[in-house]
Amino acid sequence: MIKETLAYKISQVNPNFSVMTGQAVPVLPPGIKLQNVTIKRFNDSLFDINEIQIKPALLSFLKPETIYTFTGRTGGGAFDGKAFVSREKSDGHSRININLNEIQILEIPGFQDFSRYQAAGLLSGQVVVNKSRRPLISAHADLNLANAMLTFPSPVFGLNNLSFQYIEGEVTLASRRMQIKKCTFNGNQVDGTISGIIILKNPFEKSTLRLSGSILPHSDFIASLGQGIASMLLPQLKSAKNGLRFKIRGTLEDPRFSL
């Protein structure tokens, strides 16, 4: 009964999302513990959650807005936050604040299943999700990815992967439009920035990319490319103080990179 009620509540927030729960048990203080939870968008798995505990703030039942606190584990890391749900049926507004702490994205299906490029790293940050009376969701996130690695399906410039000390970014979501407002990365081979728009589609891997930015290759990386490629890049780097401009087009499953 608990699992069915939760699944119904999720579908009421947005019919495109569903939740599957392996086990649900009550806990004290009054609340619920869910184990082996999978969150899906349409038929695509986005997140696998090992465990999450949800507890209501009992005094909030006397107010126009009910508050729930939650803590959980996923991807070897942790998350916590609060959900604010309006009790007015005519309002239908809700908000969720989420704090992420060193979650390994290699274990998150939503990061792995929709692209040929394998991504790894420890994700931390804050996410705020808002839902209006209509089935419209907006979100804002400030995120940090530490010890990150992007592995290519086949070598690029002789590299099997790119590794980064950190990637920091600000992301917003309005309906199907995801905007990377600013993102900086510091890596072992290249540094740079990226921004732009991702138009979300169904299936998710068909989402279109309109991204651009700049990269500044490290000198030892340029040297490793060989004299031919290095001789082509060095004049461009000398004339571009902020690095080489690039674009990424195509889709999540098949991104196209160009200088």
List PLM regions with ranges.
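Terminal hydrophobic membrane-targeting helix
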Residues: 1-81
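Acidic, Ser/Thr- and Pro/Gly-rich intrinsically disordered regions
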Residues: 54, 65-68, 77, 105-110, ...
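Transmembrane beta-strands of outer-membrane beta-barrel proteins
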Residues: 68, 94-96, 139-141, 211
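Short "repeat-start/strand-capping" segments in structured domains, especially the N-termini
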Residues: 66-67, 120, 136-139, 198
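Beta-propeller and related beta-repeat scaffolds in trafficking/envelope systems
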Residues: 22, 44-59, 136, 140-177, ...
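Amphipathic hydrophobic-ligand
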Residues: 43-54, 73-82, 110-129, 158-169, ...
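Generic short beta-strand segments
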Residues: 35-39, 100-106, 144-150, 216
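Short, solvent-exposed aromatic-acidic interface loops
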Residues: 71-75, 143-149, 184-188, 214-218
